[in-house]
Amino acid sequence: MRNYLYTIIFAWLFCSQAYAQSIPPLSLPSIFSDHMVLQQNSKVKFWGWTNPRTTVRIIPSWGQDTIIVKADNRARFEVELQTPPTSKKNYQIEVKIKDRDLIIKDVLIGEVWLCSGQSNMEWNSAKGIQDVKDELPHANNSEIRF
């Protein structure tokens, strides 16, 4: 009975390990997500992780080229994406390995501004912008993202 139990456990472990290796992981850092904005007319570093030496295909919808890269021994891949001039069009970036893929949707290309400074970021519109209550209902520009 004891040998039978060990055989079942060993078979289960072997099968689960083989299954886990058959589905390669694919992940991106959280800064690459739906509704993001990329800087126009620039080379943007784009990276992620998968199994070591796995071929990764990156397909930005603004270009006609598929970028092919191979993950290194530490399971990391990195490319530079050439972005087009600004536009009102929503793009997507497809990242594919074997039978798995990730799609980043609603990507805008435009100007990316980085706001910093403790006192600057603490300031809000109630502290000195004239007519803020009249202007806020009309502030509905979907092309500005925070």
What positions do the PLM features span?
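Cell-envelope and extracellular/periplasmic
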Residues: 21-146
